[in-house]
Amino acid sequence: KKPLGKLQLLFSKAVRILGGDFRWQTLPCEFHVRIQGMNFVIFEEVPSGATYLHLSENADRDKLVSDPAFKKEFIKNMTERFRPALWNRDIGDGHVYQCPDQSIIGLSFAEIAKHRNIHVAEVFVDLLVEYGNQLIWKLVIGNERDDAINDLYADRTGSNLMSFSDAGAHIQNMANYNFPLQMLARLKNMRKNGLETISDEHAIHRLSGELADWHGIDTGYIKKGARADINVINPENLHHSLDSIVEADFDGIENFTRLVNRNDGIVNSVLINGKVAVRDDQCVETLGKSMGYGSFLRAS
């Protein structure tokens, strides 16, 4: 896995030299996803996966994956190394999270393939045929290397923004809503392991004022007369369990859950426009129900 961070920063710099104002959106934590069967957008990057996802009925999908021709095409797609893609298509990195077959929970697809002595992509299709959406697995798509992500943290050329999550569009696949806290926790751990990196002050600016400046929004700074949008956190409790994924009820939809992260013991309080919105990890009752917690932020 070759890091693309430096190449991305170079591309952004080249665009600016040519008169553009381009920034990469950077997720500053590991890109964790949880997938039911084959129901995730990364499979649209390969023809066999796109064919599967474009079928709306489960019966049609089951029929497709049971076809030997599909398995052959899927294996071919998973072994192609020169197709442009976000995902490296190493499906062996995936680990089984839930499955009717309790014996494979916690194992990677690579480990299962080794045990069965067949190609890892073939193992995946076999499990998909047998269990369908009851096969739930997890995967780290990117940002797993501290040295690579550190290049993106430390960039002072204005080539990237610490601003990408996309969890709100994939509520049953990912839960990176607390990526600012995850970034601070990762920096703490990187320093503990002897890796030279940016200061907490610089990181907080990258997560607040820098974003506001680029978007032309009058916020992101603590100063006299400014909106009092403030998070108070306990840095002693920053830890790696911030990226742990749990299921929570989705308000407004019965019997439907979404994936979230927990920040227990970290967020002391949150002020929005000077009003307390969160106290000791808990939202106050008036949040989302009464006026005054915010206003439309117009870009300049």
What spans do the regions from the language model cover?
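Structured C-terminal cores of nucleic-acid metabolism proteins
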Residues: 183-184, 203-206
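Active-site neighborhoods of metal-dependent hydrolases
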Residues: 1-197
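Acidic, glycine-enriched loop/beta-strand segments at the rims
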Residues: 136-143, 198-202, 212-247
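Ligand-binding pocket scaffold of soluble enzyme catalytic domains
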Residues: 220, 268-269, 276, 296-300
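Divalent metal-coordination and catalytic microenvironments
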Residues: 25, 117, 166, 203, ...
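Short, surface-exposed, low-complexity cationic segments
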Residues: 285-300
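C-terminal cap of metal-dependent C-N hydrolases
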Residues: 152-160, 177, 232-289
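Short, well-ordered loop/turn and helix-capping segments at boundaries between secondary-structure elements
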Residues: 14-17, 129, 186-193, 209, ...
